[in-house]
Amino acid sequence: MEMTSTSLKRGCLVVEDNDSVTPHDETKKQKVSEGCLTSSQDGVENDGLHRSENEPGPPEAESTVKDDENSSAQVQEEEEEEEEEDGLSEAGEEEEAESFADMMKHGLTELDVGICKFVSSHHGFSGILKERYSDFVVHEIGKDGRISHLDDLSVPVDEEDPPEDALTVLTAEDRQQLEELQLFKNKETSVAIEVIEDTKEKRTVIHQAIKSLFPGLETKTEDREGRKYIVAYHAAGKKALANPRKHSWPKSRGSYCHFVLYKENKDTMDAINVLSKYLRVKPNIFSYMGTKDKRAITVQEIAVLKISAQRLAHLNKCLMNLKLGNFSYQKTPLKLGALQGNHFTVVLRNITGTDEQVQQAMQSLRETGFINYYGMQRFGTTAVPTYQVGRAILQNSWTEVMDLILKPRSGAEKGYLVKCREEWAKTKDPASALKKLPVKRCVEGQLLRGLSRYGMKNIVSAFGIIPRNNRLMYIHSYQSYVWNTMVSRRIEEYGLRPVPGDLVLKGATPTYIEEDDVDNYSIHDVVMPLPGFDVIYPKHKISEAYREMLAADNLDIDNMRHTIRDYSLSGAYRRIIIRPQSVSWEVVAYDDPKIPLFNTDVDNLEGKPPPVFASEGKYRALKMDFSLPPSTYATMAIREVLKMDTSIKNQTQLNTSWLR
């Protein structure tokens, strides 16, 4: 039976997306995956803009010369700002919560970013992914197909771990003092442990126990008033822990400790920064396959260079909303993008659909899938969409780039951002506007700092102060906007079947569907390009639609190379329809809107029984499980089920009604 498409005619709101993403360089060659047929299109999807430890400096225009003194000053400024901003996060979160609903009144809708078609013809219904992040759980799927779970908190024993008697020679008080010394939690520079039964064997065991259990500490024996003491200390002060390569490391271990990170309501980079601070190491010794967003419970694999499992396990005593486990030692780190995808468990509360509607919707999702649109978080949550900034970059309209980022905007923001924008509009003085920002690591602060350093006539270099992945986010957003719009046009014109002139991939090579082989393909094989200098376009009406859309934005589809190499994008290919794997669902009845409707990994570790549901209840919820390849958006799958607008602007209205 031929599938038909359904246009979006109803406005509502549902969910905040928590899809995982993997930042990559857009200019890399196309790579094939089921979701997006390149590793270069994932961009930076999280709402927050994060500093990278390894970010290169600004792209240089022809007239720009590297300035080592400025670079050193920048590092010093950033270190001072990190200390300055430590106490600001909680207050900022409170203010953000108060202004969120107002801010969303000025946000985007799906229609604004080209999202307007559906696959299934079933009747839509409403449902809410509540503000509770626990209704959205993401488990990473490795290349081997294994779904990451936190189900083991034990520490592996290797050949060079201390013998059992070494673990008993230190009292609980000794261990606490040594741990505080190791993590610089007290002002002491050493810890002295008296040797009660003074024998060489006993002293040796204590030395071994301290060095094994507390890497980074050195020991020596001292005589004090006729008594023997083992004294533990940092060999090189605070720098000792900053370079784990200098620590003693058992030869039997791989250099990397792999572990499962379970986190609640915290994005991956924030979690790694927390671990780094506790361990007193740089964030860049951690590696991972993809980042997971904040508003969810997520489980993923992390690797860290030469930090012992025992030391990581100790952190479970003091971490909030984070838990580490499933430790193992491996020879290699993890690589970005080296994952098969993610498994989602999603609860949609207070659904209005009948059991028959739910059945039709979920069967369609399992059998046909959903349109592989870029989700709403790709385009930002404020009155200035990220794709508008990206378009200005591609147009070389640098004054417009500066204005779009810094100008006052409708909708509520954090108070200090409002004051900063007002100061900028009034004075056009970057130094003066920068003083209004207590948090200077935001994109506005980074741009203002660049303008202060390079001047108003060198906006290119000033913009280059912003970390590279965050700069590329803007142009990826524009590409995504074009792709969404063109896919909607393609489905409007030709429906959900392959036609001659469509593109498919043979391996990594794009090829056209011809008249005589159209029956050899399905809609799931069809790809469409993101605009760039190294892609081809369909051989039908949609090719001209691409050209017209870019021309309307003063861009030449035949000349997508930019004068600045970073902004020259090769393009990529992306499947237009995705069929989720491992799809299952159930409708449950409940009375209390606050109760959890399934167990998390931590619940299972703690032995909590799974929730029991009554046959009838005040409300009904749809619990969905499904797996998606990388670079696909779970909200777009949920949108297909509900037939509703997933923009936060619409979601805010529905959630407000639900909470009354």
Curated annotation (Swiss-Prot):
Active site: D293
Phosphoserine sites (modified residues): S7, S126
Region feature (Disordered): 1-99
Reactions performed catalytically: a uridine in tRNA = a pseudouridine in tRNA; uridine(13) in tRNA = pseudouridine(13) in tRNA; a uridine in mRNA = a pseudouridine in mRNA
Name of the featured protein: Pseudouridylate synthase 7 homolog
EC number of the protein: 5.4.99.-
Cell compartments where the protein resides: Nucleus
Functional description taken from the UniProt entry: Pseudouridylate synthase that catalyzes pseudouridylation of RNAs. Acts as a regulator of protein synthesis in embryonic stem cells by mediating pseudouridylation of RNA fragments derived from tRNAs (tRFs): pseudouridylated tRFs inhibit translation by targeting the translation initiation complex. Also catalyzes pseudouridylation of mRNAs: mediates pseudouridylation of mRNAs with the consensus sequence 5'-UGUAG-3'. Acts as a regulator of pre-mRNA splicing by mediating pseudouridylation of pre-mRNAs at locations associated with alternatively spliced regions.
PROSITE patterns: TRUD (PS50984), UPF0024 (PS01268)
Subunit structure: Interacts with SIRT1.
Any one GO cellular component localisation term in the record: nucleus
Family, as annotated: Belongs to the pseudouridine synthase TruD family.
Keyword Transferase: no
Transmembrane segments: none
Biased composition (Basic and acidic residues): 22-32
Species lineage: Eukaryota, Metazoa, Chordata, Craniata, Vertebrata
Keyword terms: Isomerase, mRNA processing, mRNA splicing, Nucleus, Phosphoprotein, tRNA processing
GO molecular-function term, one example from the UniProt record: RNA binding
